């Protein structure tokens, strides 16, 4: 095998030169004689996508690629590395993909409690496939929308959930949608070249082979095929994606099937909305009084004591007792209260008032007051009326 390799290289060079001279605007593919023979081992040198060159011809050695050695532990169709002159233009269509990027969530996902949480990153092969489909033009967007529809509109993992049902988009090795020996990359490259982007043809072909290998690896997890793929094919993954009993205090809206979860009062306390805590006049108990509480009426004991109306006999006995002793004793007060049918407090207050009147009538208070009264500067002497005193 090592001695026969230079001959396919020379044949490939001549075939590429003839194809470039005949059709400069088309896409030329060359197959080695080993691929059409009986020893078709499916190696990497079977199909090599080459980007078309403009009107001026390029050197014949530039588009040539050396065949890679076959490893039995690799997938049947690993992605061939792009040439050096195609690696730089392959990253140019990404700004266009960012401008026409569609939203990857719906309104039912916003209501789920785990919306916005960081998810695990998809495989790098799927990221390359997504970038290639985004740069391929309108066809890439159609395939992306079709993948979301086939995945049951579950956009939490827009790339990860597409892998089990990738047979509807990309041909897996065990599917019946076409021969896996290079016709699928050729079709993808032709579609990209018709769209007017020849630089993305090789990248799209390589990404298609990588996505097909990833779909073949993830095929045993979904036995329903590509039509029923997505998150609905694997209930285990769906359960881990949206745990139903992860946090009962947060899972108020949304469950595994998207319906509302009804929580009773025994399971969870009443949760007030956010606006309740921003206003005072609400229905919560701690909002404060809306009306002023009425003042408690004072009891009759706290009211002012009514004026006591003494009889003539009572006033005569009190004045006689005051003449005998201006300060009545407790024992004498109790005896007088029983004789006159009065309270002890009434007798005590009458004696206090009588002493205050006499003190005010005499005007003898202190030395300073006497000195001022002698100079005529302090004269507060009052005349008492006997009738008023007797009535009291």
UniProtKB/Swiss-Prot annotation:
State any single GO MF term: DNA-binding transcription repressor activity, RNA polymerase II-specific
Task: Report the superkingdom from the record.
Answer: Eukaryota
Q: Where is the composition biased (Low complexity)?
A: 14-36, 85-100
Q: Which disease is it linked to?
A: ENDOVE syndrome, limb-only type: An autosomal recessive disorder characterized by severe shortening and deformation of the legs and feet, 3/4 syndactyly of the hands, and toenails partially displaced to plantar surface. Radiographs show normal femora but severely shortened tibiae, triangular fibulae and malformed or absent bones in the feet. In addition, genitourinary anomalies have been observed. ENDOVE syndrome, limb-brain type: An autosomal recessive disorder characterized by marked mesomelic shortening of the lower limbs, severe hypoplasia of the tibia and fibula, absent talus, and rudimentary and short foot bones. Hands show short and malformed fingers with a missing digit, and nails are absent on some fingers. Affected individuals manifest neurologic symptoms including seizures and generalized hypotonia. Brain imaging reveals absence of the cerebellum and hypoplasia of the brain stem.
Give the family from UniProt.
Answer: Belongs to the engrailed homeobox family.
Its source organism is Homo sapiens (Human)
Q: Which GO terms describe its biological process?
A: adult locomotory behavior; anatomical structure morphogenesis; central nervous system neuron differentiation; cerebellum development; dopaminergic neuron differentiation; dorsal/ventral pattern formation; drinking behavior; embryonic brain development
Q: What is this protein called?
A: Homeobox protein engrailed-1
**Which parts of this chain are annotated as the region Disordered?**
1-100, 132-164, 219-251, 282-306
Give the location in the cell.
Nucleus
Q: Where is the composition biased (Pro residues)?
A: 51-66, 75-84
User: SMART domains from the xrefs?
Assistant: HOX (SM00389)
Compositional bias annotation for Gly residues: 223-236
Entries under Pfam families matching the protein: Engrail_1_C_sig, Homeodomain
Q: Which keywords accompany this UniProt record?
A: Developmental protein, DNA-binding, Dwarfism, Homeobox, Nucleus
Upper lineage ranks?
Eukaryota, Metazoa, Chordata, Craniata, Vertebrata
- The regions listed as transmembrane in this protein's record are none
